Curated annotation (Swiss-Prot):
Zn(2+) binds at residues 38, 40, 96, 99. The keyword Lyase applies. The lineage of its organism: Bacteria, Bacillati, Bacillota, Bacilli, Bacillales. The gene is ytiB. It is an enzyme of class 4 (lyase). Its cofactor is Zn(2+). The keyword Metal-binding applies. Its EC number is 4.2.1.1. It catalyses: hydrogencarbonate + H(+) = CO2 + H2O. SUPFAM superfamilies: beta-carbonic anhydrase, cab. It comes from the Bacteria. This is Putative carbonic anhydrase YtiB. Reversible hydration of carbon dioxide. It comes from Bacillus subtilis (strain 168). One of its GO terms (molecular function) is carbonate dehydratase activity.
């Protein structure tokens, strides 16, 4: 049986037994916060528990490395929607130690892309269109500096309100310990 079939089979039972009822909440975050975190599997349950968050408390936006790499990309758009449409009054950027994004390179990514059957012509077309793969697959050396950079992009976005604090934290994916990098109340 495929993973998709397993999911659909589980979902059928989940909905028939009305398991969803214990998760019902509104679309507005009770704690009025949006969190940008990494998509690392170790954080799926650890991060909310380490922050004492429950379903409905916050908006969680996930990206590789918790990076805001483009001020007008989908991550920044999601943060702006959380603030203006969903009543988030604070934003947290949460990176983590041992992040895979600190280890990737555009060269390695392109090799893996080609190994999966994507022809060189497509890659060249993308390059010709102006995409800089080194920038697009940007990694980092320091998670703390990376978090500060993402906080800076958010805070200085021309559409981001000045009165909304943007915090930066780093979580240990083994213990859940949070280290404060940027206190948005002080900026």
């Amino acid at each position: 049986m495929s993973l998709l079939n397993d999911i659909l089979e589980f979902n059928k039972t989940f909905t028939e037994q009305r398991e969803y009822e214990k998760y019902q909440t509104s679309k507005f975050p009770d704690k009025k916060m949006a969190i940008l975190s990494c998509m690392d599997t170790r954080l799926v349950e650890l991060l909310p528990h380490a922050m004492n968050l429950r379903n409905g408390d916050v908006k969680i936006i996930k990206s590789a490395g918790a990076l805001v790499t483009h001020p007008f990309g989908s991550i920044m758009r999601s943060i702006l929607v959380a603030v203006y449409e969903l009543n988030a009054d604070e934003v947290c950027v949460i990176g983590h130690h041992d992040c895979g994004m600190s280890k990737i390179s555009s060269k390695s990514m392109l090799e893996k892309i080609k190994a999966r059957g994507i022809p060189e012509e497509r890659i060249e077309t993308i390059k010709y269109s102006g995409v800089d793969f080194d920038q697009w697959f940007k990694s980092f050396d320091s998670v703390e500096a990376s978090v500060k950079d993402s906080v800076d992009v958010i805070k200085h976005h021309p559409l981001f309100p000045e009165n909304v604090p943007v915090h930066g934290l780093v979580i240990d994916p083994k213990t859940g310990k949070l280290d404060l990098i940027v206190n948005g109340y002080n900026n």
